[in-house]
């Protein structure tokens, strides 16, 4: 049969090709119209081939097919009885009808059409290959897009994909068999009609928008293709159709799945929340209400219905607001879940409303209103609303932090919950690189650190986390965080903050960040230099909680993991009424009697702040205990027990902060505060050396509770009055203890007004106390800052006892005291005042000591000249005899006065006649002119010295003259033993002047004899002449002597620098060394001439002896001894100098003053400004 078919096909090849070409041209020209007519004609011609023919064709194929595949291929063809399995009944009837009607014309038409189709397929082979490549590209692109859509959706089940793959395999096999069947069969019309019918059905299902020409061309290409390629091509086409079906079906499934949870959400919200609770319980999270089963058992059906109506999301039935209010009013049972949910919603509204009204002035008022409501039940809502409000308005962060600080002082668990949520929010934002959330949360944490709600360790951890990975955003967040809490961190832990600033400096030097961020770092350093003056830690109006009343939470970034979001949801409470009553009682204790008043009774913000601070202090509870009439035992056993407990707590604690917390928890009464302070002071005094633990502890206690400041002030005043009762060790410990309190400003500096430093009230114990007290203050503050503190106007009145300015004697004593303890720099003002004081004292008419001493000599000068002359005329001898013993006393006083004047670089001036007013005026003029070159301190000592220089008026008596002269000689002998060289010079001068003095004595004797003989003749004339001559001589002698002595003393008082003095000594030593050689040469020359040896000893006396020759060894030995002596002196000087704390120049002047003038000296060193007075 195959051979006959092949022979019949050969002669018909050419016409078929021609027809195909003509058909192709016509199809191309006609376009869509020809394709439509072609499909309409084919619809009527349905395949009705016999089943046996199909089976024979399948068996004659080159490759074998299994039976199942054969049956599947033959399923669509009708059997002999006319039935078809796959087609519906109508189709099978139509096929039978067509087969019977067209049976006569069938064989001729089929042969012609099959030949034409084959010729057209050969001509269109090239166009088919091109179209195939394009189809492959499109199929690849669609497969990719489908794979991405399927991966994104992820909702297609595995079973569906398996069924789809099987269906694809079946259809591809059917297609391959049909195409192969068309090639080996004579009646090609059957194959063409079946395939076109199938394509039409697929187009109807999909509703594709492609043109009929394109589908027709693809159909023809599929016919032309070889049997090996045809299954793949058909497979790709079928896959496209299946993909479209699968995508549409997938979308439907996804839509169904999305609609399912909406129905579930409409269920009861209460049970959904309780399921969450049960899940949290299984995970180990806390739940107060028990498991879900217990809660479901507790709620009745009636309560559940009302709860569904009020709390479900859909709202149940459509309820008007009036009807909803009526339903809510009917619910009065507080134990029901509906009532509790309504109360919770009302609480949520109140909290949101109050938090939105907060500002700087109304913080205290709003916190009081919040504390009236049960914020313990709504703590989750409260924290959530505060965080949300702070995120929306970051400028009010400090206000929200102050409100949280007040709530935290009363309910620490609420403050801890809010802080945990903030930390978790910051960690999540940091992980997601959300800069805005990081800024808001870190800003809030910084202000909580300032309010002492959060510990500073949390702030340091956040800073290290941000700076470890220095990006632009991280550094910007760190800078804003440091600006807000930098002032507080520098107060608490300055070293760690300094390390963070060093890291920022390194980041700035690297220059890897943006210029804007680098500029921000520079601005931060400038803010730090200014001391964060524009970024204060707490504003005064927001410092509402005392330090001792605040509870600080120590949280770490790693520890905080669970934010407790379940507290934001509603939970049913069995004991609702009892819990509400407990909270009301607690709020009354917190707010006091004002808790029951109306909101308008709180008044302004300032009054509310004071009321809140009084509540915070907790004094009302103590007063209630005293007024309740309870008997308080204040006998000794209680005091002993108190001492024991305090002593044990002091010894058991490792840190002063821990100890302060424990001591403040003891809740001491007001009468026990003085005893408490005294116990602390006794424990400090009993130590061998001072321990800073006690100073830090008292500072902490005084800052936590300011009522302890006054007892410590009273104790300080008592100790200043009773220093003689204490041991030196206790005195030192107590003085250092109070110095620490003053340095830290724990107590005010006004307590120093009880100290008086005068010569009359000076006691050794008090001096020891003041010495150690001031030295400890200088160690803490430094001399410059301490002096600056003392010069403030506030302390001017309190330091009048320590630095007196009323009396020069007290001034001098205070200066000497402070210089002796090494604090002479404090007394610069007193030294200047002492220089000015003697000038102003005589001019003033006050009753000071200066005026009283200066007024004494004026009384002696009040006598007139006439009275003196009358007295001295007749009673010269008597006056001399009477005044001789008084002169001795006066001269002894003169020696003391001269020593004082020599110590203060001054000269002594004698007054000869008090009778002569003219001579007195001249003397005062010379005195004032000479004193201009001398320091002002010398004038004061001269003024204080007693006036004992008045001479006797009985100058006519020779005996008085002789005695006066002899005593003058003795005075010169007593004065001059200070210097050996001066002695020698004065002895030589005395030896030269001795004959002149003898002659003078003789002359005076002759004058006396002549005067005695001529008394009877002319008493008055001789007396007057002799008096005038002798007065003139005495004036000349006094002036000459005073001038010479002034010059000598002034030269001695000219202070020379230590370096110049050493150079002078070295020159003298060098001259002394070379003196023996000069004397040797001179003596050798004298001996040659026959003259005696003219060598002089150290005193200037000549010696007649030979000079002993020195050997070199002896010279070396003496030099070494001299060096040893010099080294020992210098070593002792350096040791004393270091002990006194002086420089070399000061020590040299000090030693000179101690040796020559043990009264005063002043250093000329520019660096030291050291003065010493005695």
Curated annotation (Swiss-Prot):
One of its GO terms (molecular function) is RNA binding. Its main location: nucleus. Pfam families: MA3 (PF02847). Residues 1-15, 79-92, 183-200, 235-259, 910-924, 1095-1118 have a biased composition (Basic and acidic residues). Residues 1-51, 79-110, 136-259, 597-616, 840-1045, 1095-1133 are annotated as: Disordered. The keyword Nucleus applies. GO terms for biological process: cell differentiation; male sex determination; male sex differentiation; mRNA splicing, via spliceosome; regulation of mRNA splicing, via spliceosome. Residues 36-47, 93-102 have a biased composition (Polar residues). Male determiner protein (M-factor) that controls male somatic sexual differentiation. Acts as a dominant factor that regulates the mRNA splicing of transformer (tra) and doublesex (dsx) transcripts and promotes expression of male splice forms of tra and dsx. Probably acts as a component of the spliceosome C complex required for mRNA splicing factor and exon-junction complex (EJC) assembly. Hinders eIF4AIII from non-specifically binding RNA and escorts it to the splicing machinery to promote EJC assembly on mature mRNAs. Belongs to the CWC22 family. This is Male determiner protein Mdmd(V). It comes from Musca domestica (House fly).
């Amino acid at each position: 049969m195959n051979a006959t078919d092949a022979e019949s096909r050969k002669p018909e090849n050419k016409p078929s090709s021609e027809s195909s070409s003509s058909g192709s041209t016509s199809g191309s020209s006609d376009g869509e119209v020809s394709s439509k007519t072609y499909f309409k004609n084919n619809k009527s011609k349905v395949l009705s081939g016999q089943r046996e023919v199909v089976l024979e064709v399948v068996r004659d194929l080159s490759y074998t097919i299994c039976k199942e595949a054969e049956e599947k291929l033959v399923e669509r063809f009708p059997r002999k009885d006319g039935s078809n399995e796959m087609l519906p009944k109508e189709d099978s009837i139509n096929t039978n009808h067509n087969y019977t009607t067209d049976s006569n014309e069938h064989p001729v038409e089929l042969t012609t059409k099959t030949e034409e189709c084959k010729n057209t397929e050969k001509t269109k082979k090239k166009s088919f290959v091109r179209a195939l490549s394009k189809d492959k590209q499109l199929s690849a692109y669609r497969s990719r897009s489908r794979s991405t859509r399927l991966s994104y959706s992820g909702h297609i089940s595995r079973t569906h994909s398996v069924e789809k793959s099987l269906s694809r395999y079946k259809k591809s096999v059917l297609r391959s068999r049909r195409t192969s069947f068309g090639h080996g069969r004579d009646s090609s019309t059957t194959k063409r009609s079946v395939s076109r019918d199938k394509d039409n059905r697929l187009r109807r299902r999909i509703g594709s928008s492609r043109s009929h020409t394109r589908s027709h061309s693809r159909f023809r290409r599929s016919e032309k293709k070889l049997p090996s390629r045809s299954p793949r091509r058909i497979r790709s086409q079928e896959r496209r159709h299946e993909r479209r079906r699968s995508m549409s079906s997938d979308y439907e499934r996804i839509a169904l799945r999305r609609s399912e949870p909406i129905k579930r959400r409409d269920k009861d919200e209460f049970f959904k929340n309780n399921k969450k609770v049960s899940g949290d319980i299984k995970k180990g999270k806390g739940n107060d209400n028990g498991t879900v089963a217990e809660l479901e058992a507790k709620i009745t059906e009636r309560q559940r219905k009302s709860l569904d109506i009020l709390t479900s999301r859909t709202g149940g039935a459509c309820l008007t607001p009036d009807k909803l209010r009526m339903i809510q009013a009917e619910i009065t049972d507080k134990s029901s879940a509906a009532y509790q949910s309504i109360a919770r919603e009302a609480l949520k509204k109140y909290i949101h409303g109050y938090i939105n009204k907060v500002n700087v002035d109304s913080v205290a008022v709003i916190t009081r209103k919040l504390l009236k409501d049960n914020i313990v039940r709504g703590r989750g809502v409260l924290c959530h609303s505060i965080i949300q409000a702070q995120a929306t308005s970051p400028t009010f962060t400090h206000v929200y932090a102050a409100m949280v600080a007040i709530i935290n002082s009363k309910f620490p668990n609420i403050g801890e919950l809010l802080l945990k949520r903030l930390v978790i929010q910051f960690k999540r934002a940091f992980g997601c690189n959300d800069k805005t959330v990081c800024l808001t949360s870190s800003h809030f944490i910084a202000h909580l650190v300032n309010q002492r709600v959060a510990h500073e360790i949390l702030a340091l951890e956040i800073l290290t986390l941000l700076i470890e990975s220095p990006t632009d955003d991280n550094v910007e967040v760190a800078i804003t965080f440091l600006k807000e809490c930098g002032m507080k961190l520098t107060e608490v832990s300055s070293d760690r903050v300094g390390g963070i600033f060093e890291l920022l400096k390194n980041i700035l030097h690297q220059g890897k960040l943006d210029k804007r961020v680098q500029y921000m770092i520079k601005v931060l350093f400038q803010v730090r230099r200014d001391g964060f003056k524009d970024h204060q830690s707490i504003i005064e109006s927001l410092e509402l909680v005392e330090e001792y009343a605040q509870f600080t939470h120590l949280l770490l970034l790693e520890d905080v993991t669970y934010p407790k979001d379940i507290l934001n949801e509603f939970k049913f409470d069995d004991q609702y009424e009892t819990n509400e009553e407990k909270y009301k009682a607690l709020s009354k204790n917190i707010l006091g009697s004002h808790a029951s008043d109306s909101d308008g009774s709180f008044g302004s913000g300032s009054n509310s702040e004071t009321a809140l601070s009084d509540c915070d202090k907790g004094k009302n509870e103590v007063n209630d205990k005293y007024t309740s009439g309870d008997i308080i035992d204040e006998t000794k056993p209680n005091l002993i027990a108190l001492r024991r407990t305090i002593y044990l707590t002091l010894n058991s604690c490792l840190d002063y902060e821990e100890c302060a917390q424990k001591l403040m928890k003891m809740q001491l009464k007001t009468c026990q505060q003085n005893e408490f302070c005294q116990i602390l002071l006794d424990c400090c005094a009993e130590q061998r050396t001072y321990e800073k633990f006690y100073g830090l502890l008292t500072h902490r206690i005084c800052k936590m509770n300011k009522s302890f400041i006054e007892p410590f002030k009273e104790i300080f005043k008592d100790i200043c009055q009773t220093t003689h009762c204490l041991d030196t060790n206790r005195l030192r410990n107590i003085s250092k203890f109070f110095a620490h309190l003053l340095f830290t400003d724990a107590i005010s500096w006004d307590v120093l007004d009880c100290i008086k430093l005068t010569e009359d009230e000076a006691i050794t114990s008090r001096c020891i106390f003041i010495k150690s007290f001031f030295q400890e203050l200088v160690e803490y503050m430094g001399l410059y800052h301490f002096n600056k503190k003392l010069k403030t106007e506030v302390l001017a009145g309190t330091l009048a006892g320590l630095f007196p300015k009323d009396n020069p004697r007290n001034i001098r004593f205070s200066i000497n005291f402070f210089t002796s303890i090494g604090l002479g720099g404090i007394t610069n003002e007193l030294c200047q005042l002492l220089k000015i004081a003697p000038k102003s004292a005589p001019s003033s008419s006050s009753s000071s000591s200066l005026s009283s001493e200066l007024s004494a000599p004026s009384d002696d000068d009040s006598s007139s000249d006439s009275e003196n002359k009358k007295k001295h005329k007749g009673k010269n001898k008597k006056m001399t005899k009477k005044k001789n013993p008084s002169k001795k006393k006066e001269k002894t006083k003169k020696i003391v006065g001269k020593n004082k004047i020599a110590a203060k670089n001054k000269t002594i001036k004698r007054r000869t006649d008090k009778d002569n007013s003219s001579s007195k005026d001249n003397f005062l003029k010379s005195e004032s002119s000479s004193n201009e070159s001398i320091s002002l301190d010398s004038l004061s000592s001269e003024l204080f010295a007693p006036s004992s220089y008045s001479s006797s008026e009985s100058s006519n008596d020779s005996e008085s003259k002789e005695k006066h002269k002899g005593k003058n000689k003795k005075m010169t002998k007593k004065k001059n033993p200070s210097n050996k060289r001066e002695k020698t010079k004065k002895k030589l001068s005395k030896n030269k002047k001795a004959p002149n003095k003898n002659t003078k004595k003789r002359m005076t004797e002759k004058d006396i004899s002549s005067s005695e003989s001529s008394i009877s003749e002319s008493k008055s004339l001789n007396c007057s002449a002799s008096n005038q001559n002798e007065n003139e001589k005495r004036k000349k002698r006094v002036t000459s002597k005073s001038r010479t002595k002034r010059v000598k003393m002034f030269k001695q008082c000219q202070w020379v620098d230590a370096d110049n003095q050493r150079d002078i000594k070295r020159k003298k030593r060098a001259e002394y060394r070379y003196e023996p050689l000069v004397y040797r040469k001179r003596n050798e020359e004298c001996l040659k001439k026959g003259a005696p040896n003219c060598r002089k000893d150290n005193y200037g006396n000549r010696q007649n002896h030979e000079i002993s020759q020195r050997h070199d060894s002896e010279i070396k030995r003496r030099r070494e001894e001299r060096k040893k002596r010099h080294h020992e002196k210098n070593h002792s000087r350096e040791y004393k100098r270091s002990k006194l704390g002086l420089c070399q120049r000061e020590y040299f002047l000090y030693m000179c003053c101690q040796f020559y003038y043990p009264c005063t000296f002043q250093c000329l060193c520019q660096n030291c400004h050291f003065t010493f007075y005695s």
